[in-house]
Regions:
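C-terminal regulatory/oligomerization modules of transcriptional regulators
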Residues: 1-8, 82-136
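Residues within the DNA-recognition helix of helix-turn-helix
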Residues: 55
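A general structural signal for well-ordered secondary-structure junctions
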Residues: 22-25, 37, 65, 104, ...
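N-terminal helix-turn-helix DNA-binding core of bacterial DNA-binding proteins
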Residues: 10-51, 73-82
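Alpha-helical residues within the helix-turn-helix
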Residues: 43, 60-61
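Alpha-helical interaction segments
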Residues: 5-6, 50, 63-67
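Beta-hairpin "wing" of winged helix-turn-helix
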Residues: 61-70, 77
């Protein structure tokens, strides 16, 4: 019998909680396509900036996302290289499961027209975390 260490169990709980929300799955669906800033997520999902920020922060904290700064923008992407192998398996299964969903397809279509030059980006509210806050 294989016993899962307590720390791994806590990480797994955080991961499954992150995946247990439709909005977070919709954001992952976008990030499977390309890296995004908060305002692109906001536009593609037709949600508020604060909700997009909270979702990205939750997915980042669960270990799914990487972050890089580019001028005004904090750009989020799936962090395939820094991810634990079991997380990669979970995300691949999630990606396959979302592929044919009508809502997910519509979100991906809206992402194609989302722009990084929106009001959220212009006032620098596009990023949730900065490189400095991640390093702390």
């Amino acid at each position: 019998m294989h016993i899962v260490p307590e720390a791994v169990m806590k990480d797994m709980i955080k991961v499954y909680k992150a995946l247990s929300d439709e909005s977070r799955l919709r954001v992952l669906n976008l990030l499977f396509e390309k890296e995004c800033c908060v305002c692109e997520v906001e536009q593609a999902l037709e949600i508020s900036q604060s909700k997009a920020s909270r979702i990205l922060s939750s997915l980042y904290d669960a270990g799914f996302l990487g972050l890089r700064k580019d001028g005004l923008w904090s750009l989020y992407s799936i962090d395939w290289t820094g991810m634990e192998p079991y997380l990669k398996d979970i995300l691949e299964a999630t990606r396959k499961g979302l592929k044919g969903n009508r809502q997910m397809k519509a979100d991906r279509e809206r992402l194609k027209t989302a722009v990084r030059a929106g009001p959220g980006c212009a006032d620098k509210s596009c990023g949730v975390k900065t490189e400095e806050s991640v390093a702390v």
